[in-house]
Regions:
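Conserved hydrophobic residues forming the short capping helix/wall of the S-adenosyl-L-methionine
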Residues: 70-73, 108, 269
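Conserved AdoMet/S-adenosylmethionine-binding subsite of the radical SAM
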Residues: 93-196, 203-243, 248-255
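Canonical Radical SAM [4Fe-4S] cluster-binding loop centered on the CxxxCxxC motif
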Residues: 18-61
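Binuclear metal-ion centers of metallo-dependent hydrolases, dominated by the metallo-beta-lactamase
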Residues: 258-280
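Conserved alpha-helical substructure of the radical SAM core
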Residues: 46-82, 96-99
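Amphipathic alpha-helical segments in well-structured domains
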Residues: 59, 101, 225, 258, ...
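Short glycine-rich or small-residue beta-strand-to-loop segments that form or flank ligand, phosphate
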Residues: 83-88
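Short, charged low-complexity linear segments at domain edges
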Residues: 2-27
Length: 280
C-alpha cells in the first residue's frame, strides 16, 4: 500500500476537501513521521515504518521557506485560501510551535491577508498553555475527536502514552467556541493484531465480527454517534467537520463511511444548532 510523506517545511498548494486551495506547512522532518497518535487509517503510514533521520525544521527555516513560496505565488497571481499546518504527524509537537504560529500570521498578513491560518491537530498537546494560546490566535483551530469511546481510541488512534478523552473534552471546552471539531467516520473489519486491540474483561464496547480473529472498526453506529454528539454539544464548537477515508491506508480492511451515513450524522449536528460539513 502506498502512503504519503510530505515535503518539509512547505508543500503544495493542494486542493483540500474541507479548506480550499491550501498551502501546507509541515513542521515535521521531510523523510519521516513524528506523531503522538499512530492511527490505523493515517495516509502517512505507521510511525515505526517511517522513522525520520532528518531533524525538525527550525523556526527560521519555516519562515524563510514560507516567505519564498508566498512571494512566488504572489508573482504568479495565485494566492492560497488557507495556510494549513499539517504534514507528517502532529504539528503541535514542534517545540517552537507557538513562535512559528506568530511568524506565519505575520507573513499571511503581509502577502495574503485574505487567507486563513488553519491547524490540523489530534488534540494531544492542548494541555500545554502555550499551545492553547497559539491555537486561539489562528483562524481555524481544527481538533480531532474521532469518538468518546476510550477502547475505540486505543484500538484505532493508538495514542502514545496516557490519553484521557474526558480530559481532552474538558480542554476543548476551554477554547470557548474557538474550535472546529474534526471526526473520521469509517467502517470495516481488521485483524486484531493490526488494531493492537487492548481488550478488557468488562466494559469493552467494541464489536466483534463472526470471525473472532477480526475486529470491527465501524464508528458510524448509534452506540458511537450518540455519545460523540453529546460531547460535541458540550464543547460548543464553531463548526464540525466529518469526513471519511480518502486515500490508501496502512491497514487493510478499512472502508469509507457511506454518503447516507455521513449525511445522517451531519444533519443531527446541524439539528443541534452547530454548523457541520461532510466530506466524502
Amino acid at each position: 500500500m502506498s502512503t504519503i510523506i510530505y515535503p518539509s517545511p512547505v508543500f503544495g498548494p493542494v486542493h483540500s476537501r474541507r479548506l480550499g486551495i491550501s498551502l501546507g506547512i509541515n513542521l515535521l522532518p521531510a523523510d519521516g513521521k513524528v506523531c503522538s497518535f499512530d492511527c490505523i487509517y493515517c495516509e502517512c503510514g505507521f510511525n515505526e515504518d517511517h522513522r525520520p533521520t532528518l531533524p525538525l525544521p527550525t523556526r527560521e527555516e519555516v519562515a524563510a521557506k514560507l516567505e519564498e513560496k508566498l512571494q512566488q505565488m504572489a508573482a504568479e497571481g495565485q494566492l492560497p485560501d488557507v495556510l494549513t499546518f499539517a504534514g507528517n504527524g502532529e504539528p503541535t509537537c514542534h517545540p517552537n510551535f507557538p513562535e512559528i504560529i506568530d511568524d506565519v500570521i505575520r507573513l499571511r498578513d503581509q502577502y495574503c491577508p485574505k487567507a486563513k491560518v488553519s491547524v490540523l491537530s489530534n488534540s494531544t498537546m492542548i494541555h500545554r498553555q502555550a499551545v492553547h494560546d497559539a491555537l486561539m490566535r489562528v483562524d481555524n483551530n481544527i481538533l480531532k475527536l474521532d469518538t468518546v469511546d476510550p477502547i475505540y481510541i486505543n484500538n484505532v488512534d493508538h495514542p502514545n502514552g496516557t490519553y484521557d478523552v474526558n480530559l481532552i473534552i474538558d480542554r476543548m471546552k476551554a477554547f470557548n467556541g474557538h474550535i472546529i471539531i474534526q471526526t473520521m467516520f469509517m467502517r470495516g473489519e481488521v485483524r486484531r493484531q493490526e488494531t493492537g486491540v487492548r481488550r478488557q474483561e468488562s466494559g469493552d464496547r467494541s464489536r466483534e465480527t463472526g470471525d473472532r480473529s477480526r475486529e470491527s472498526v465501524d464508528n458510524t453506529g448509534e452506540e458511537y454517534v450518540c455519545p460523540w454528539l453529546e460531547a460535541v454539544k458540550a464543547i460548543k464548537p464553531q463548526q464540525v467537520m466529518i469526513y471519511t477515508i480518502d486515500r490508501e491506508t496502512p491497514t487493510q480492511g478499512l472502508l469509507k463511511a457511506t454518503h447516507e451515513q455521513l449525511d445522517a450524522i451531519r444533519d443531527r449536528v446541524i439539528a443541534a444548532g452547530i454548523p457541520c460539513t461532510a466530506s466524502y
